[in-house]
Amino acid sequence: MMKIVLLNGSPRPQGNTAKMASAFRTAAEEAGHQVVQFDVCRMNIKGCLACEYCHGRGNGECIQKDDMHRIYAELKDTEMLVLAAPIYYHGISGQLKCAIDRFYSALYPKAPESLKYISMFLASGDKEQYTGARFSFDGDFLGYLGLEDKGFFTSAGEVQEETLDEIRRMAKDL
């Protein structure tokens, strides 16, 4: 059994991103994995202050007192991180970006030993909109943190059943 943290960065509870996240979560849980999902658009997560408290007196803890601490608690022993978001202006939603920026205290300079894998689900109105998100995914999560890519899934327009099936297969094969 694997522990997985899923961050859903979509404000639309029935939108394409939510459908992709739900397909993953259901299949992963059916395969015996524990999935802890956070809908970051419904959480109180402030932007990083760049104060460096976390890398000084905070000893890895962020000075801000908001809902991000719930995510930090789960990241400490998770094996996989799944990021799901709609694309706005060639990048992920601001809410998910804000949460990722706050990973600075928990994942930098080094991710927890347990964290090995990552996957990303993106939805947009056009198949040409993923370049910015892909650049960040490859550079930050695969490159800098050295996580293993378990899949980068995209859906332009209405999410297709074929895409959902690919996500389900990946979840079951973990």
Language model segments and positions:
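N-terminal beta1-alpha1-beta2 submodule of the flavodoxin-like/Rossmannoid cofactor-binding fold
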Residues: 1-84, 90-105, 143, 149-150, ...
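Short glycine-rich anion-binding loops that position phosphate/pyrophosphate groups of nucleotides
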Residues: 87-89, 125-126
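Short, glycine-/small-residue-rich phosphate/pyrophosphate-handling segment
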Residues: 94, 109-151
